[in-house]
Every structure is written in structure tokens, then in C-alpha cells.
């Protein structure tokens, strides 16, 4: 008699499926990576036109999050495309498992893909735009805000991509739903990232407030998405 498969084992199977598919096709990583490079080129052309008339350090926090958000949207839009094209969503739903396991596996896979692109794109951003500015001692703290922001983006984006997967204009609908929902997170992460990169007076207070709010957002939205996912995926 076969024993019941644990939720953790189901999670590993689903996560492994996503990772193996991506390693075989490179669809998400390639498209997200090329898009990130294109955004960096556009930023570079814009700053080249302005010359030294712009303070890149004070704009860097906002630019980093523009890069991350729109790159993540491209990946989230394809989060369930393989399952839809292969018509296997229905098959997964027939498996006797907690639907939240599907959500958690997709959240982690989306976070891994986004982090992989960030590991390449953010050093390129620094190389292109920040080398002319002396790095602040607080510079390493910006990693914390990027990590918290990426978790929140993946948590919310995974739920919303499930909602829009069958929509005719799913990419447009995903962006329309995604941006307003993550705006509070973006606001706090931009403030925290800018404070860490600039390192002005009292930067730690701004950074701490932003990180705490981002962490609270991640917890609330991840739990809410986890609870709602059963209803969303079964609708």
C-alpha cells in the first residue's frame, strides 16, 4: 500500500519541474535577461544626453526598481504559460494535494528566476552608472531592500499571474493589476535602496523604516496570497 506523499515532497516535485523546464528551454531567463540589458541601454542613452547635469546617486534607487519591476513582469507573464500550452493545469489540479503547494512552488521558482537575472543586471547597473560616484559605506545594505522587494514581487505576481493566465490580454491585465498592488512595496523599497546607496545623514532611519515596512508587506501579502490561492486556481 502506497503511503500519502507529503506536502514537502509535492513541493519539491513541482519546483523541480519548473527548474528543469527552464534549464531545458531558457525561455524566462533569456527573455528577462535581454529585457534587463535593453532597459540598461535605454538608461545609458538617456544619461548620455544629460551629461553631468543629473545626480545619478539620488536617482539610482528608483532606476533599480524600474529595472526590477518591469523585468519581473516579463517573467511573471510567462509563469504559467508552459502549463497552459501543455494543457496540464487541469491535470495538476486533479492530484490530491493542497493547492497552496502549487502556489509556494511557483513563488519559489519565480523568485529564483528573478534573483538569477538580478545577479547579472544589478552589477551591470552599478558598472554603467555608479562607478563615477564614490560608493557610500552603507552601500551593502541595499541588498536587504532588493531581497525583500523581490520576495514581495514574486508573492503578489504569482497570485496575479494565476488570475490572468486564461485572459485574452493577460500581459496587459497582469500589469494593470500588478503595479497598483505592489506600489506600497515599491515606495518603501525605493526609499530604503536610495538611502543605502546615497548614505546621507540619518540614512539608517529611512532605511530601517523602509525595510520594516517591506518585510511587513511581504508577510501580509504572502499569507493572503497563500490563503486565496485555492479559490483563485480552482475558479
Q: Where are these predicted regions, by residue range?
A:
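Transmembrane helix segments
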Residues: 45-47, 160-201, 205-209, 213, ...
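A structural motif at transmembrane helix-loop-helix junctions in multipass membrane proteins
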Residues: 134, 145-179, 231-235
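Aromatic- and glycine-rich beta-strand/loop motifs that create alpha-glucan
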Residues: 1-32
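Transmembrane helix boundary and interhelical loop/hinge segments in multi-pass membrane proteins
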Residues: 22, 73-93
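Membrane-interfacial helix-loop-helix connectors in multipass membrane proteins
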Residues: 46-59, 122-147, 193-211
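Long, hydrophobic alpha-helical segments
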Residues: 60-76
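Selective transmembrane-helix segments that form parts of the transport pathway or gating/packing helices
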Residues: 99-126
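Junction motif at the cytosolic side of a transmembrane helix
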Residues: 218-235
